[in-house]
């Protein structure tokens, strides 16, 4: 087993999940995104099979947090909203020395190998 003792202990002390049944009589009542529900709760799973449940109130709280209002630190400034547009750089011609070097390189073709099955 790869789970640590504290992880195993947390699994054994899991709280019962409160569920509620919503009857949908018309396909129009189905949400646009199938991982969400009519009540606004989002359900997801990890590749390992862990079920994630995000309630609507929790997600709305995250939306207004200061962390969600700040942009990531590694985004170029030209992609940030509200920055003035800068013109694209004009294409600079390739130096002739570089063209001569690439022409002088000779790529030798090798015969295709046989694969025995």
Swiss-Prot record:
Provide the GO MF annotations for this entry.
eukaryotic initiation factor 4E binding
Q: Which domain of life is it from?
A: Eukaryota
**Residue interval(s) of motif YXXXXLphi motif:** 54-60
Induction field: Up-regulated in response to bacterial infection. Expression is induced by foxo: in neurons, foxo-dependent expression is activated in response to insulin signaling, while in muscle foxo-dependent expression is activated in response to fasting.
Choose one Gene Ontology CC annotation of this protein and give it: glutamatergic synapse
Tell me any Pfam family this protein matches. Answer: eIF_4EBP
Q: Which GO terms describe its biological process?
A: antibacterial humoral response; cellular response to insulin stimulus; cellular response to oxidative stress; immune response; innate immune response; insulin receptor signaling pathway; negative regulation of cell size; negative regulation of eukaryotic translation initiation factor 4F complex assembly
Q: Does the keyword Cell wall biogenesis/degradation apply?
A: no
Q: What is known of its domains?
A: The YXXXXLphi motif mediates interaction with eIF4E1. Compared to other members of the family this YXXXXLphi is atypical and interaction with eIF4E1 is weaker.
Family as reported in the entry's similarity comment: Belongs to the eIF4E-binding protein family.
Q: What does this protein do?
A: Repressor of translation initiation that regulates eIF4E1 activity by preventing its assembly into the eIF4F complex. Hypophosphorylated form competes with eIF4G1 and strongly binds to eIF4E1, leading to repress translation. In contrast, hyperphosphorylated form dissociates from eIF4E1, allowing interaction between eIF4G1 and eIF4E1, leading to initiation of translation. Acts as a regulator of various biological processes, such as innate immunity, cell growth or synaptic transmission. Acts downstream of phosphoinositide-3-kinase (PI3K) to regulate cell growth.
This protein is called Eukaryotic translation initiation factor 4E-binding protein
